[in-house]
Amino acid sequence: MLGKYLAQSAGYPDKLLGRKGFRMIEMRFLRWSVIFALVISGCSIEVAQPSVQTPDSIMTNPGTSATNDTTQIPVTWSSLNLTGKLIYSMGAIEKDVYVIRVLSLDLITGQVTTIYQAPNSAWVYYVSVSPDGEQLVMSFSPPPGTDPEVVQALYVMPIDGSRPPQLLFQPQIREDQYTQAEWSPDGKYIYYTHVNYQFPIDPNRVYPLYQIFRMEYPGGQPQLIAEEAYWPRLSSDSTRLTYISIDPLSIKQQLIIANADGGNAQEVSLSGSYIPDIKDAPIFSPDEVSILFSAAVPTQSRQPTWFENLMGMRLARANGSVPSDWWSVPINGGELTRLTHIQAPSLYASLSPDHRHVVSFSGAGVFVMNVDGSELTILLPNPDQFIGTVQWIP
């Protein structure tokens, strides 16, 4: 089912969408001519990841380099005195074609520069910047038929767009998919999530088996960090890891903190009047005494959200996620604090270099807020409800 594949390719788990949600996604993307007709053949694999080819030995690339096109947008957030740049992916309908770009926004000048434009019918989801600000790693699905060996894999490219993306390593088999790639702040490792929707075959399993790996960059080999887990994020000193674990039989989620190598994994207990079942995109707070994460809001009658009122738009309930808000919990566990009341889908956050602000990508737009959720300000619209990521660099 195309809608289900597109949701999975975006890195959002099946349980976040109902049957109607998959169908609405399918209809919307068919209309936009983003057709991912991927034929997956049945086979089994070993759990352990094999040794991988290095980028020097792999010639595969998505084939389209940077355009270096620039546009200017009003700096409506000038009163906040924000500095640095946002690196993000964004999709939009242009002349009946869905175009996906990796972009850079200068927060001082409002200049938007295209780093990379994906070929038609390709898909870019997760984009992460190396700590030295020189390279990008992204989760990329090539256009159907262009690379029979890749459904969704990790690619690296220079942030100046001087070379097209190069495959980080060759998937063992076509059905292996890779997403949620994060550079460790010390620059030594790339962490990522692996999933194969056909393996393992288990009639009792109602959810795919996600795994978190890391590999030294450049030239390292995959190292298994966590089973039944996704959404890896590192502390600023690269010593601790937070992620979401999920039981593929019961679909029960847990928020986890572990050592950077996956050892000493412990659940962060949540308490309060409302404990969300769906949790995504955890990130350490600037002072690293708490974890921020996206979670579904309590069930209630549908009302226009903050974004919808602001932008004069209505969002479909069937998107890559569910209406969510940012929450925080002490790193050692405790009562939840709801930071926002926006009910926006597909949230993903990054800290400002000075650790004073949080920028968040969402299916409704890109916004900035204080760490406590106050003074929320819209930066960029997302009218076509693209599911992407954002990173704030100096």
Where are these regions (language model features)?
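Bacterial N-terminal signal peptides
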Residues: 33-42
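Sequence signature of WD/YWTD-type beta-propeller architectures
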Residues: 43-394
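Short, Lys/Arg-enriched N-terminal segments with co-localized hydrophobic residues
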Residues: 14-25
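Intrinsic-disorder-associated, low-complexity terminal segments enriched in Asp/Asn/His/Tyr and depleted
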Residues: 5, 12-14
